[in-house]
Structures are given as C-alpha cells and as structure tokens.
C-alpha cells in the first residue's frame, strides 16, 4: 500500500539559488521555476507553463554537432532580478570560450537546385566562346604593345599630353653640293628622272635627296617671287600717287594767263580771276578799267 502512495506523490523540486522567490525573500508567492533540460541546465526561453523535466526536441543528425559545444560547456548563468516596478531585468549573457561552435562544412546539406559560381564556370555556350576569344585577343595585343607605350607625365593637364613623335634629323649638305644645286636650279627649275639621277650621282647624293631639295627650292622661289611682285606693285602705286599730287600742286601754283577777250570786259576779267579756293579775298587783283 505504501508503494503506490509514494508513486503518486510528486517528486519535490530541487531548491534554486537564483529563483525569483528567493531573490525577493517571499516564499509565499507562487513562482514557476525556469524550465530545465535533461542535464539539469535551465533554459532562458523555456515555456512558462512547461514541466520541470521537459526537454526541447532533439536536433537532427546534421545539426548534432552544432549544439554539442553548448551542451558540453553548460548553460548560461541566468540571473533574473525583479525591479521595484515589476520589470524583470535579464543581464547580458556572455558565452564561454568553448561554447562558440566551430565551422561545420558538412553540417548543412548543399542545395543542388541553387547554382554556384564554380558550377557556372564549367558551363560553355557558343557566345561565351566568342567573347573569351575576343577578350584574349585584346589582352594579347595590349601585352604586345606594352613595351612600346609612352609613359604619361604627372603634373599640369597640359603637361599630361603624349609627347610628339621624334622628327627625323635634317639632312645637311656641303657647300659644294648646295652651290651646284643652286646653279642647276637657276638654269632649270624642273628636272626629268634621268637628269635628276645623273645630278645625284655626280654630287654623291640619293635621288630622293635631290628630288626633295628641288621641291623645297621651288616652294621658296614661288614665295620669293610673290613677295617681290607685291613689293613692286606697292612701289608703283606709291609712285602714281606722288605724280598725281605733284601735278595737282603744279596746277594750283601756276598763274592764270588772262584771256585777251576778257581784257576789254571788266566783268569777264573778274570772273576769270575769281578763285573760290582762296580764303583771302584781298589777294584778288583789282579790276582796272581800260576804257
């Protein structure tokens, strides 16, 4: 008879040192203890109405290693305190050094439906082949031109321009060669191919040098001729203006010969001697009566 009675009697809970009733020193208040796990560790987020010995559902096999460090290291130390206003204060929890789970490469099963970057790299399409070939050719051409590229200077924007190409050195001729070329040019402005070759051979020059020299000399001759003609035209224009001015001044300074007919008529004589450009009218000679 005593065995069934003892079986029906619930097992008393173990005293908890951090229970709310012990913190408040009020054993009369009914407070449910925090749920505990199978190994006696309490859980902070346990159900409020759960049984003391109830445990959370076990993790699947793939997640078994994820919770092992936490179970081995024990539970967090929970210290619940009730403020005078009735608010439960939960301090910040710091996990133990051994409670941080190590990285598990095989803990989560890979999802075959989601393609990864490595799997996309193995795919080949016709347009991808042409793009790769084009990029490869461009990189090859850039690598081939790298040794010949000119480095740009750092400084003012106008100084960052690529320097111009180096010009070829100017060919210098001797005085004897220049003298012979000038003599031939004064006699003949244009040379035939055979004449040019013979002249180049006699002066120990190349055919291209003789041809280039004659082209430059003709250009210089045309420019000089145009300048000389312009100077002659301006000189002739100045000479004509000077002659016109002298003739006009001579016509003004020459005295007017009186007409014999006007000598016997005072009115006609006065009109003949009238000079409107004269400012001083006193210079007009007086009319004398010849009657």
UniProtKB/Swiss-Prot annotation:
Q: List the disulfide bonds.
A: none
**Location, primary (coarse class):** nucleus
Tell me a GO biological process for this protein. negative regulation of neuron differentiation
Q: Does the keyword DNA-binding apply?
A: yes
List the Pfam families. Homeodomain (PF00046)
Please indicate if the UniProt record lists DNA-binding as a keyword.
yes
Superkingdom field: Eukaryota
Q: Which SMART domains match?
A: HOX
- What's one GO MF term for it? DNA-binding transcription factor activity, RNA polymerase II-specific
Q: Where in the cell is it found?
A: Nucleus
Q: Which GO terms describe its cellular component?
A: nucleoplasm; nucleus
Which residues fall under the DNA-binding region feature?
A: 166-225
Annotated region described as Disordered, given as residue ranges? 1-51
What keywords is this UniProt entry annotated with? Developmental protein, DNA-binding, Homeobox, Nucleus
Concerning PANTHER family, the annotation shows: IP01054P, T-CELL LEUKEMIA HOMEOBOX PROTEIN 3
Protein name, please? T-cell leukemia homeobox protein 3
């Amino acid at each position: 008879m005593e065995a069934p009675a003892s079986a029906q009697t619930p097992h008393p809970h173990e005293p908890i040192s951090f229970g709310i009733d012990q913190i408040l020193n009020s054993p009369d208040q009914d407070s449910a203890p925090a749920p505990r796990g199978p190994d006696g560790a309490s859980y902070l987020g346990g159900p409020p109405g759960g049984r003391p010995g109830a445990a959370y559902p076990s993790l699947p096999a793939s997640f078994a290693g994820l919770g092992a460090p936490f179970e081995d290291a024990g539970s967090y130390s929970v210290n619940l305190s009730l403020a005078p206003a009735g608010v439960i204060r939960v301090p910040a929890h710091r996990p133990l050094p051994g409670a941080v789970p190590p990285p598990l490469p095989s803990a989560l099963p890979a999802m075959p439906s989601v393609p990864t970057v490595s799997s996309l790299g193995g795919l080949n399409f016709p347009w991808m082949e042409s793009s790769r070939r084009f990029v490869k050719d461009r990189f090859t051409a850039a690598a081939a031109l790298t040794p010949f590229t000119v480095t740009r200077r750092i400084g003012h924007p106008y100084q960052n321009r690529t320097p111009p190409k180096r010009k070829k050195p100017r060919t210098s001729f001797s005085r004897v060669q220049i003298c012979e070329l000038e003599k031939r040019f004064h006699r003949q402005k244009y040379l035939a191919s055979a004449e040019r070759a013979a002249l180049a051979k006699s002066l120990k020059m190349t055919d291209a040098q003789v041809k280039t020299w004659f082209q430059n000399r003709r250009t210089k001759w045309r420019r000089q001729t145009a300048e000389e003609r312009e100077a002659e035209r301006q000189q002739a224009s100045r000479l004509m203006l000077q002659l016109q001015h002298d003739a006009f001044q001579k016509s003004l300074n020459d005295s007017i010969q009186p007409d014999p007919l006007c000598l016997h008529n005072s009115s006609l004589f006065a009109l003949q001697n009238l000079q409107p450009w004269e400012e001083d009218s006193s210079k007009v000679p007086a009319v004398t009566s010849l009657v």
